[in-house]
Regions:
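Glycine-rich helix-loop "coupling/hinge" segments at transmembrane-helix boundaries
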Residues: 131-132, 160, 207-243, 267-269
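Periplasmic/extracellular loop-to-transmembrane helix junction in inner-membrane transport proteins
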Residues: 13-17, 45-87
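Hydrophobic transmembrane alpha-helices
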Residues: 38, 113-120, 131-132, 142-156, ...
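Transmembrane-helix boundary motif in ABC transporter permease subunits
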Residues: 84-114
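Membrane-cytosol interface at the C-terminal ends of specific transmembrane alpha-helices
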Residues: 104, 137-201
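N-terminal signal-anchor/first transmembrane alpha helix
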Residues: 12-43
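C-terminal transmembrane helix and the adjacent membrane-cytosol boundary/short C-terminal tail
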Residues: 104, 238-269
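Loop-to-helix entry region at the N-terminal start of transmembrane alpha-helices
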Residues: 73-81, 123, 131-152, 236-241
């Protein structure tokens, strides 16, 4: 096969991949539109109770009303708390994972505690955290960190331990220090592990923030959901849930962009 034929086949292959991506996106949008149309139709025909389930037109009306009544403030509060909790949970989790990888003794001592903490429902710690930290933003951020921290430690530590043993043996043969093994082998080999941690943590941090806002906040999307439920404004609840889904999707998309950037940078190094 000559170079021209190979280039043509590659272009055809890439074109098919692009077409498949567009087809997937189009199908997703079509499903969403059909779902919303069916929801609106069933509510208008009173087949479902719009007071309980709301409907797209009422949600849109609620959204436009919220836009003129501090909606951006509520979105910003939840986003800010999530980002702080996400960054702290990820950073502390990776640092602790490195410390545990460095010290086999500490790793074995902490293992049962980490397993117990991981299986413990973190939301149940909410009242304790509020008493310790106080009601307000700090308590919400601590809850976000508490939910994401242990998962980050376990996932990264597992990645460090499973790093190619032959590479580490070779480095030891050349009398590399533990720090050199960490920076030259462990960390570069676990970029995908770090990225996976980010993907998981953005969702976990948001869960922690919303749980905290349910308990103590007077602003944020979690607060809007609780308030809407208390005064039986189901339109407000559904609108807040949808906005929350959009915020979560945008945050996850940001992590995917970061992943592409890191992999692209690594590829051309």
């Amino acid at each position: 096969m000559n170079k021209k034929e190979f280039s043509l086949e590659r272009k055809t292959y890439l074109k098919k991949i692009k077409q498949k991506k567009y087809l997937v996106l189009l199908t997703q949008l079509l499903i969403l539109v059909l779902f919303l149309a069916l929801w609106e139709f069933l509510a208008n025909q009173e087949i479902i109770d719009s007071f309980i389930t709301s409907q797209p037109s009422r949600i849109w009306k609620t959204l436009t009303n919220l836009t003129s009544n501090d909606l951006l403030k509520h979105i910003w509060v939840t986003t800010y708390e999530t980002l702080i909790g996400f960054l702290l949970g990820t950073f502390l989790g990776i640092i602790i994972a490195i410390v545990l990888w460095w010290s086999d003794f500490l790793s074995k001592v902490s293992e049962p505690f980490l397993v117990v903490l991981n299986s413990l429902p973190k939301v149940s710690l909410g009242p304790i955290i509020i008493i310790w930290v106080g009601a307000g933003t700090p308590a919400i951020i601590v809850m976000a960190v508490a939910i994401s921290l242990v998962v980050t430690i376990l996932e990264n530590l597992n990645g460090f331990i499973k790093t190619d043993k032959e590479l580490i043996k070779m480095a030891n043969t050349f009398k590399a220090s533990k720090f050199q093994i960490l920076t030259k082998i462990i960390i570069p080999a676990n970029l995908s592990t770090f990225i996976n941690s980010l993907k998981v943590n953005i969702g976990l941090s948001l869960v922690g923030v919303i749980s905290g806002e349910f308990l103590v906040s007077k602003a944020g999307l979690g607060y809007l959901i609780v308030y809407g439920g208390q005064v039986f404004k189901l339109d407000l609840v559904m609108t807040s849930v949808i906005i929350l889904g959009v915020v979560a999707g945008l945050m996850y998309a940001s992590v995917l962009l970061l992943e592409k950037f890191i992999l692209h940078t690594k590829k051309f190094k």
